[in-house]
Amino acid sequence: MAAAKRVGVELDEEQIHLIAKALADPRRYELLRQIGSCTAPMECADIRCCQPVSAATLSHHMRELEMAGLIRVTREGKFASYTLRRDVLKAYTEQLAKI
């Protein structure tokens, strides 16, 4: 019997570096934990109320997490919601385990 084909996320070196950089910041790590603790997409307003930073600072951190591929952003008009991309996080930890 043939081996099952593995379906997953392939990370290139650039994305691995972006993820490492994103997770190195304690605020972004906490934001990722906060988003990951929800089973449904988390609204920006809900994230904002729990973070003692300005809207601009929060926006910067969320953009870094998005650029790293760690979160999926869904925009509806001027509102945004965020979801943890568990597949990307899993692929990253698997890459680290190979070191």
PLM region spans:
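Alpha-helical residues within the helix-turn-helix
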Residues: 49, 66-67
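N-terminal leader segment of winged-helix/HTH proteins
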Residues: 1-23, 68-70, 76, 90-91, ...
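Short, hydrophobic-biased segments on the C-terminal half of alpha helices
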Residues: 62-63
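An amphipathic, aromatic/His-enriched active-site/gating alpha helix that lines ligand/cofactor pockets
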Residues: 99
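N-terminal helix-turn-helix DNA-binding core of bacterial DNA-binding proteins
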Residues: 18-54, 76, 80-88
